[in-house]
């Protein structure tokens, strides 16, 4: 079972871009500044560097977060250009796609006519792994399934060797096969890894600087990421292999192998994203010391053609990203949202996330919808947590419940633009969703947003009253206020897979998947944001509430507990993604799962949205703004 759905060959899909451009409306009017923050002398010092107070034009003293402004000027975004949308690049890519298919088809078969069976299993696994990490697997779904069916036909409880006639299984082939087969929905047990442990449960590897030995442990480490709950051997494999690799990388010269180890140790699996991995692997695969390019051509494999195709596909998609980003930036300008100077404007960063996880050209509606929705969520978060008054928040909630453009007239001036932006974004996404779902999903989505805003309101009440809830009370509300459901629901409905209500409930509220993903997002966010949130007057976090329930615990104790919860959730999410009896299309499961990976990556070092000037800025450049050299 493939993790990525099939897609038509065309990489440009200009029709959506053209249609969305026509939907852009001119700025409705000059936007008044009533309710905006007066920058400058109206700021008054506060007790924290993370919180500032400002006097708004209506005379109220309001709390605002001390966030940096938008990093990506619209003029800069509109000036972006690339030649990779030209037909000649697409034509060359199509030719290479055909040649790579021939590589798959010429692999050794059971009759042994194509090649000796000494390496027929590991070569298939290497090809599948390579096209996936290079970001070109969508073109080879049939070939990948055929290759993995072949490998699986020789799989047994003791693992596999390099070839079908191998007398003994080996760690490298077995770990690679286990990881790839499990990710594609084949039934494989982690018990197979116990074959390579001694009687004390230790993996029998001596320290080595040989590339073959180190790469074997690297593949064991990669396999350990795809753990399900209760798989102790996977935990043991991760502990052993991570320690081994950290020691080994210090002893080998800088090379494609050291670069690959550093990246894998840094990002693992659940803090990674498909396009980010592709961008890194292009450097690894094309490194002068790469063993794959050293081989260059074998009887059926041409690594240079794989690399050329991957670079072309990366850059062709890059041309589509530019068009979508230019549309999104115009939407942001025309929406009036830039006038809300107290808010975090991170539409470019959210688009980067969406295009790093939804890498098929045909999923433009998902990418743009996710970016819009997340940006609206962030601005509303700044209103509900800091800038807005309780009376204003209740007015906004009522306007969303009534769901009529005329409701904006009852709102404060600064809320009118965000209300209309939300109204128009959800309405537009519902139209896109109707094309694939065959029904109007707007009311369903709107109800989800009502619940979401109610959870925000609860947090605002806690802030206003200084109330610190119990951990259970906090987490129950936080599963909704994390925003995962609001961010994911409507974009998922735009995917090209039917999600009738009975199926949708298996991935949306009240499903186990939604519960886990929402809990994960809030808990991971808390571990990175709780100190800054506390400085802004937001006392309630999973850390503080857990400490309240358990007097005598330190912050470090609470953090350790929350991180342990996160690790358990990741394993349960792996199961929800890959369990064999799910009736939810893999495309929908995969995109919902990728959203958790994306947010995990952004929260890896810090709150990468509030502070988007460091790793997040680099992510935008490497995966969206810059093509790779051909």
UniProtKB/Swiss-Prot annotation:
Cofactor: Mg(2+); Mn(2+); K(+)
Catalyzed reactions: (2E)-geranyl diphosphate = (-)-beta-phellandrene + diphosphate
Pathway: Terpene metabolism; oleoresin biosynthesis
UniProt-annotated location(s): Plastid, Chloroplast
GO biological process: diterpenoid biosynthetic process
GO CC terms of this entry: chloroplast
Family the entry assigns: Belongs to the terpene synthase family. Tpsd subfamily.
Name listed for the protein in its UniProt record: Beta-phellandrene synthase, chloroplastic
Organism of derivation: Abies grandis (Grand fir)
Organism placement in taxonomy: Eukaryota, Viridiplantae, Streptophyta, Embryophyta, Tracheophyta
Gene: ag8
């Amino acid at each position: 079972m493939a993790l990525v759905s099939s897609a038509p060959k065309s990489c440009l899909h200009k029709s959506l871009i053209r249609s969305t451009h026509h939907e852009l409306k001119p700025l409705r009017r000059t936007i008044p500044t009533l309710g905006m923050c007066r920058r400058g002398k109206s700021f008054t010092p506060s007790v924290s560097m993370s919180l500032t107070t400002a006097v708004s034009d209506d005379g109220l003293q309001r709390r605002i977060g001390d966030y940096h402004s938008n990093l990506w000027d619209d003029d800069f975004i509109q000036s972006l250009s690339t030649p990779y949308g030209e037909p000649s690049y697409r034509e060359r890519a199509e030719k290479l796609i055909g040649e790579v298919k021939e590589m798959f088809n010429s692999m050794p078969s059971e009759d042994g006519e194509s090649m000796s069976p000494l390496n027929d299993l590991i070569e298939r696994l290497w090809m599948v792994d390579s096209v996936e990490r290079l970001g070109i697997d969508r073109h080879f779904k049939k070939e990948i399934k055929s290759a993995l069916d072949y490998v699986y036909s020789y799989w047994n409880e003791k693992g596999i060797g390099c070839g079908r006639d191998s007398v003994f299984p080996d760690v490298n082939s077995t770990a690679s096969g286990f990881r790839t087969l499990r990710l594609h929905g084949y039934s494989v047990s982690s018990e197979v890894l116990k074959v390579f442990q001694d009687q004390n449960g230790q993996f029998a590897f001596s320290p080595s600087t040989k590339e073959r030995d180190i790469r074997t442990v690297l593949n064991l480490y990669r396999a350990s990421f795809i753990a399900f709950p209760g798989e102790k051997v996977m935990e043991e494999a991760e502990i052993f292999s991570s320690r081994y690799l950290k020691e080994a990388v210090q002893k080998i010269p800088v090379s494609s192998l050291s670069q690959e180890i550093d990246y894998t140790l840094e990002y693992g699996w659940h803090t990674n994203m498909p396009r980010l991995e592709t961008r890194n692997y292009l450097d690894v695969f094309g490194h002068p010391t790469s063993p794959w390019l050293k081989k260059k051509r074998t009887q059926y494999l041409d690594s240079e053609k794989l690399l050329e195709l991957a670079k072309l596909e990366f850059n062709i998609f890059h041309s589509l990203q530019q068009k979508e980003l230019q549309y999104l930036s115009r939407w942001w300008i025309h929406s009036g949202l830039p006038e809300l100077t107290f808010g975090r404007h991170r539409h470019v960063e959210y688009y980067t996330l969406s295009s790093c996880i939804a890498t098929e050209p045909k999923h433009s509606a998902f990418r743009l919808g996710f970016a819009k929705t997340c940006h609206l969520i962030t601005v509303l978060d700044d209103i509900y947590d800091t800038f807005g008054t309780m009376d204003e928040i209740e007015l906004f909630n009522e306007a969303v419940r009534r769901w009529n453009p005329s409701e904006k007239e009852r709102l404060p001036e600064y809320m009118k633009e965000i209300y209309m932006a939300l109204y128009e974004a959800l309405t537009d996404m519902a139209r896109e969703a109707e094309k694939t779902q065959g029904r109007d999903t707007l009311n369903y989505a709107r109800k989800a947003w009502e619940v979401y805003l109610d959870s925000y309101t609860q947090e605002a009440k806690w802030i206003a009253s200084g109330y610190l809830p119990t951990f259970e009370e906090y987490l129950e509300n936080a599963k909704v206020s994390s925003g995962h459901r609001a961010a994911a629901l409507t974009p998922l409905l735009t995917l090209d897979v039917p999600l009738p209500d009975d199926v949708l409930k298996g991935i949306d509220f009240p499903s186990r998947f939604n519960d886990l993903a929402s809990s994960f997002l809030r808990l991971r966010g808390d571990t990175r944001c709780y100190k800054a949130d506390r400085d802004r007057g937001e006392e309630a976090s999973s850390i503080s509430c857990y400490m309240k329930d358990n007097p005598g615990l330190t912050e470090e104790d609470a953090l350790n507990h929350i991180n342990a919860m996160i690790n358990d959730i990741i394993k349960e999410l792996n199961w929800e993604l890959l369990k064999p009896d799910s009736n939810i299309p893999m495309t929908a499961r995969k995109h919902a799962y990728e959203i958790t990976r994306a947010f995990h990556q952004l929260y890896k070092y810090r709150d990468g949205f509030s502070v988007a000037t460091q790793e997040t800025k680099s992510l935008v450049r490497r995966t969206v703004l810059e093509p790779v050299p051909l």
